[in-house]
Amino acid sequence: MPLTLSRWLPGLLLTAALPSLAHAEGPEYGPELQGFEYPYTVKHFAFESQGQSLQMGYMDVAAEGKTNGRTVVLMHGKNFCGATWDTSIKALSEAGYRVIAPDQIGFCTSSKPEHYQYTFQQLATNTQQLLKALGIQKATLLGHSTGGMLATRYALQYPEQVEQLAMVNPIGLEDWKALGVPYRTVDQWNERELKVTAQGIRDYERTTYYDGRWKPEYDRWVDMYAGLAKGPGKVLVAWNSALIYDMIFTQPVYYEFKNLKMPTLLLIGTSDTTAIGKDIAPPEVKAKIGHYDVLGKQVAKLIPHSTLVEFPGMGHAPHMEEPAKFHQALLAWLNKTNPVR
């Protein structure tokens, strides 16, 4: 059922009246992140999906210098965009890879539909259509956070097109609902997302992503997310975010890790404590979820051809926290592991 924008106006007016929930902090960006500068040129892929015309923003960055003829596709996380891969794009390009970094539907520079049936299968299909249009038949996937769940689904759906699979602190290494996390409805998620602020994002990420640490360079990414959430498209941004959270919570990939056939790399910051719904979970449930120091080892045993690289003391985004150390480990594995041809 299409979203009726007027339905949400009372909530928006209420939000505007509560300065503790929404305040004029930082920049505002358009509904497709207009006004935010990406590290490379953003192109747009137009396609039809679920009876509507949509577009995906993406970066297509050629190898610098001598190319190795291979392509890496980057899949961003829930609170991230293609732009947050900036240091990874540079490192991979300098190493001879062509790099494709799309923004998925509902995110960042891509369409925010009024109605969309979000599934990881659908997002994988959209991405595969983009790669086909770009003439890419095989690629290595690198997924971060929610992008790890999407990369897993893509690898299961199109195994013949995936040479290698690498995941950076993917969420979905456990099934939160099976472990007792309560269900939050789409409407409840939407109400929560309408109240997003830069300070709220910063506090959450400092605690959950970075183990209490913060670097000034992270503020750019907070402003990106918060600026989109409070900009002129905030109603549709929040609604799509709510639908995406429901997809993440209800569509686990955990039970299918055993079916992955390609070489797989898990890059895990061990101090990460991310778990969807943790904020509303009972204390006894909260205590047992989101332990990446344990989850990485457990899931590595489930994936047939896996390699685990841990970054002790790092959090949810080691590629942003310590780029040099992260990319050294990533490139070493990519270069020594024979891709599926």
Model-flagged regions — what are they?
Residues 196-258:
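Conserved alpha/beta-hydrolase catalytic His-Asp/Glu region
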Residues 121-139:
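Conserved acidic catalytic loop of the alpha/beta-hydrolase fold
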